[in-house]
Structure formats: structure tokens, C-alpha cells
Amino acid sequence: SEMCIRDRFGRKHVFNTEQEDHSWIPTEGKITFPSTKKHGWHDYVDSRRLEITCGEAPFLVSRYDAATGAILPISQRIGLLDRKLRIVDEHTEDDLMWWKWTLRAFQSVYGYEFQGDSLLIARANLLLTFVDHYHNRFGTDPDKNHLKQIANVIVWNLWQMDGLTETIPFRKPPEQKVEFDMLDMLTMLDEPNSQDVPAFVRLYDWRAKTSLSYSQLLKGAKQ
């Protein structure tokens, strides 16, 4: 939001200026950052962002006009990941550094969605966003190795989940047992129904290089 941008940068209209008709005009020139500690461009790119019930992930990437479906020029895109990629493009001259921080930008954004078809579109939107930015930078399409690395991040960071239970949809959430009796012991010997086994979501912390649960990710983000 504009308030978050103002808190981080100490000024308004860093990326774009909204018009009365709710359209926007992107700012021109290289975006500068405050000199205060942990407010540099590296910190901005690494800052984690989560879009809940993300649908097609319009807050992460804005590849197209939601009303018309027309593809937007890169300069007109204002999604959270779009902004990070703009910063990377403006602040890196070396191609290897561009790739390093582009990858980190993708590693920093997360989203979950209940509906599988919407999730598929969201993942495609992020992957195509990478293709767009790569082509804009180098004038050619990315090779298979770069695509595989970005795709691996996307399938980890955008996942299917029921936000109420924090489990895979249609899986039964675990019940809180107060007592444990003989009947419980007998039922434990039965083959469980796969639909009754809770499946908690596992994510990946790319900086710590470890897998963790969704609740652990939220706890770490609040610290």
C-alpha cells in the first residue's frame, strides 16, 4: 500500500502516481533509497511479501489489465514483484548480479490459493513475468536452466491451501484429543483414509535453506 511505501522510503509516489480515474502514471528515473540501515535496495528486494487467497496473483504481478486482458508494458506494472524487479533492473549493471537478485526477488514473494485452476494461472503469471523481464533486459528469451530455477521457486512459493485450516484443501484438519482410550489404540491399527489424514503445507525458507510449515513462516515474518 501507499502507506507502507511512505514508511519505507519517507516519501510518496515512489513507483507511481495514482490519478482520479484510478489509473496511474509510473515514475521516471532510477528510484533512490534512504541511507538508513536496513532500508537499502537489497533489503527491499529481500523483504518477504505474502498475498493471501491470491487468485491469479494480481497484487504480486500485474502483467495484464484485469478488465480487458491486454498485456501491460513492463513500465506500467505495479505488482509487488514487479516493483522489486524494477529495482533490480535499475540497481544492477552486471548480468550475474541481475540474475542473483532477480532470483532473490522471486524467492521473497509468497501466495496461497484454494482453487487449483486459479493457482495454475497465478504460477503462469509469475513465470511469464520472469520471461518478460529477461527479454527486456537481454533481448532474448531465458534458457531452460534459468526457467527451471525460477519455476522451482514459484511452485514452492505459490501453493494450494485452505486458509482456515492451513492444510491442503479437502483434507480433514486434525482434531484435538482430550482423552486417549482403548478404542483409540485399536483405530490406530486401521489403515487411515487418505482424506482424513491432515496434510499441512510445507514451504521453503530460501535464505535459511530449509523447509518449514506455513505457521513457522508467519512466525518468522513477525519477528
Give, region by region, the residue ranges found by the protein language model:
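Short, small-residue-biased leader/transition segments that mark boundaries at the very start
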Residues: 2-5
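Conserved S-adenosyl-L-methionine
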Residues: 17-166
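Serine/threonine-rich low-complexity intrinsically disordered regions
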Residues: 10, 17-21, 40, 92, ...
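Conserved proline-anchored active-site loop of SAM-dependent methyltransferases
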Residues: 44-65, 109-119, 158-167, 173-209, ...
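Charged/polar, solvent-exposed surface patches and flexible loops
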Residues: 7, 124, 128, 216
